[in-house]
Amino acid sequence: MESRQLGVAVLVIAAGIGLWQFAGKDSDDEHKVEAKIDTVQLAADNADISIKVSDDDTTSVTEKRHYWFFKHGDAYSVDGSTLKLDGDCGWNCTADYEVTVPRGTKVVGENGSGDLTLTGVAGIDADSGSGKVELADVTGDVKLDLTSGDVSIRNLAGRLQVKGNSGDIDAEGLRGGAVEVETSSGDIGLDLAEANDVQVKGTSGDVDITAPGGYRVTTDTRSGDVENNLGNDTAGTHSLSATTVSGDIELDRN
């Protein structure tokens, strides 16, 4: 009886060791994409994604996978000139991405959960469920719809539209288009490098805006203070509207 129990225990341990050898693996796989890419489509449920432009007009994808047992195929696909990051790498597998694309590439789609870092791309129209969003040196219009997470934007040459639910929004070096920012909970900080129309709506959080002069200014807060160091030029060519339900509003001239 004892020998039988010992045999069963040995088999259980051996099976556990066998499973351990296949479970919880990580890998970094780099792929060169031969197609000429001009659009990246975000379609992953859970992924940290970093996209930057290259100087040699090439596209590469590095998949950082965490998986059990075996890898199954690639976690991306190519359709014509569109690179799709779908995170589809098999059972109990997740993939993060580091992507390099040609200049002039736009980013569209939806990232369910995870951080999003985009540098030098030519425009963005994307949704993000949960995670931090960092944008830098974007050369076209940006449209973001966010559920939860902070947003940081540096040096944008285009129109900015951001709608957030929870998280701080901070943007500087804005030029080339109107600015529309709305969030339910979180602070909003904007620094405009050139004058353009600005519309900011907050519910709970402070609003700080730095901009050139020459604005027709309207402000409103139900619970908080307003400090307007920008002035109000009734003959100004651009309008600035800043409202929040609960929070302070500060306007400064750069």
Indicate residue ranges for each PLM-predicted region.
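Short, surface-exposed interaction patches in beta-rich subdomains
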Residues: 151-254
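Hydrophobic membrane-insertion alpha-helices, especially the h-region
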Residues: 4-21
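Exposed beta-strand and adjacent loop surfaces of beta-rich binding modules
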Residues: 39, 48, 58-60, 73, ...
